Amino acid sequence: MEINFVNKSKKNDLDIKSIDGKTVISINVKNQSNYDIDQMIDGVERFLDKKINVNFTNIKGEDAENLLLKLNNISFSYTNPPKYNIPERYFPLLNEVEDYKKIVIEPNKYQDTMLKYFIKKIPKNYTYKKFSLKRNDKNFPLTAAVGAGSSHKSYFLHVFPKKHNKNWDDIFLIGKCVTFDSGGMNIKVRNMEEMKTDMAGSAIIMGVLNLTNKLPKNINLLIPIVENYIGSKATRPRPVLPSISVKTVEITDTDAEGRLCIADAVEYFNEHLYNKNLKNPLLIDIATLTGHTYYISCSTSSIVMGNKKAKRYMDKLYECGEQTKEFIDILQLRENYVKSLKSSVADIKNWSPQCKAGTLVGGAFIDFFVNKNIPWIHIDVAAVVYNNDKVKSYGINLLTKFLEKI
């Protein structure tokens, strides 16, 4: 089976032929919108085997990049004859996208498996620290509370350069890795079958690191690895727990678990990594955080918010989204959002019925823990990594281009 993208004026939009006993599908992209190309690919997917060859004719540069990223939920090999002129930098991106889709689409990848997978993918010029969490872990108390009901251990992984260069910018990427999210004691009543993808944020940043580890930047990955499950030891609603910095959190909803894990990662950064000698530090978290993003973006873009210090970075991220066709929508975080999370028994609660804007409230909760001296961006990708039974290869190209440009 072979699929060709062509760019010719005098050619049908879609041709399916049998040549020497092999099915050859040609998709003409001349004057076609991204939506039209998506529709054509969706229309022929039922003909495709698990392994196909992807070839290009008269398509160059970013057009080829953006087209190939539309081949979601299928596996492919690819060739690069000289006449096709596909940029060399793109082939590592293809590999990372393929790895991302495979790990996200497979269910029941438990914490041990994910930890080994991530460690195996760490570039040679990087190293790591791993933390095995106890049930009432004082170093990562909120993540430990999320994983209390699981029969599998929870972990925290910190990936960082073997040699820190003081002249390079310091970038910190947090990726949510909830291997499966049942909702905990506040059990999900719908769409639980999609929760195998709740570790997409961590898979995205690991792919990004493998594409950017040669850039003149000190890139750190912070990954809480946990399963939010039901069991006799699962965290009940409304306990009050201390965070790493001893800020107290009332857990009013065990299904708002992602923000708890990210808060641990943010405070790990605050307590152990932040210092005044960092050069242009930037903190970014990326997570499948809230289902409310479906109502905002119609599954076409991620939702982004951040603090005032990060405005120029968010503007640059928006530009990169337009270039890569991995779009973002930027929302404003206002003080009244975090006020809705005020607790009578703790410093903050992780969910409140007082504000129905769930995506904004999730961001506001994380913002409560962020060091105000640091530019911080929150990227909620819940609506764009999994839709209509397909894993979407969103985020890797976007963040790679962003880190190349800042």
Which role does the model predict for each range below?
Residues 8-14, 19-20, 101, 111-406:
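A generic structural signal for tightly packed, nonpolar segments enriched in small/aliphatic residues
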Residues 1-165:
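Glycine-/small-residue-enriched capping loops at alpha/beta junctions
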